[in-house]
Amino acid sequence: MKKIRFFALLLMFVLMISLAGCSGSGKKTIGIIQFGSHGSLNNCYDGVIKGLEENGINLDDYDVEYVNSNFDAGVSQTQANNLVNKKAAVIIAIATPSAVAAANAAADSGIPVVYCAVTDASVMENYTNVTGSSDIPDFSKQLEVVTGFMGRNNLKIGVLYSTEESSSPVQVESLKEAAKAYDGMEILDSAVADITTIDTKTNELIDRGVDCFVNLLDNTVVGKLETNILPITNEKKIPVFGSEIEQVKVGCAASASIEYINVGKDSGKAAAQILSGKATSEIPVSRTTEPNNYYNSKVCESLGLTVPSDISLNDTAE
């Protein structure tokens, strides 16, 4: 009887292991947490799906559970905890707040985490069983674009950033360092602790005499670009230079832009490798750094900006 009980328990244990990462349908679960919806993060998601499919993953064989945190880090944490409780086979987290939430939730669970578009990848170094893709802005290239359109170097540049995004203060310092190459250039930054105050913060920088704004890779601020920031700056005829192509499409003047479809593809490829049996330790973090230059001719015309002839540019205006 003891032997029968032992083998029954052993069989139950084997079944539990084999079903780890499976949903009620019997399929393994791929969890995807997107911090919020704006152009670059949506492109990341599309890239993740393409990266999975292009690297041998038939998504019909999996339950893909996609959740969106609507720019709320607390919601990201709850969503990550839920995916861990469901024993997802892998969790893909798009943007830094979601990545940190997923890594915290999955710690000691054995569930691998693949992050996507984490600008300061050092924030993930203390976690185990994680890998992913990093989007590193080239602020030197960005300032070449800004000064080309503005026609001078001695600019006061306004920067808004969210205190909830750990990579944003690092980006501010990198931008200030790049600005040292331009005589008379000054970076005026303003931290946004409460996103409902972003209108006030935008107007405060305008009152301080900024000539233009430069966006960081800050999802919380970029999420308010169309609804809050651009209506104010357009009325005052103050250009906003975006951090990626989708922002230029919706109203920024220009940008030295990383291709976020490719950032997402890199994370999708990493997740596919994990699902095919590779360990996260065998998959190096990918870093996208080389930008392409874009501008919006309609926006530039409305703001009275002259398109520089000495910079290679692609027009996003439709």
PLM regions and their residue ranges:
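C-terminal motif of bacterial Sec signal peptides marking the signal peptidase cleavage site
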Residues: 18-21
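Short beta-strand segments enriched in small/hydrophobic residues
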Residues: 26-41, 132, 155-162, 213
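Extracytoplasmic "Venus flytrap"
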Residues: 29-55, 65-74, 164, 219-224, ...
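Periplasmic-binding protein-like
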Residues: 31-33, 83-96, 114, 157-160, ...
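An alpha-beta-alpha
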Residues: 48, 135-182, 284-300
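Flexible loop/hinge segments that line or gate small-molecule binding clefts
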Residues: 101, 105-140, 242-254
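Hydrophobic alpha-helical segments within soluble ligand-binding/sensing domains
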Residues: 120-126, 131-156, 258-278
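Hinge/cleft segment of the Venus flytrap/periplasmic-binding protein
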Residues: 273-318
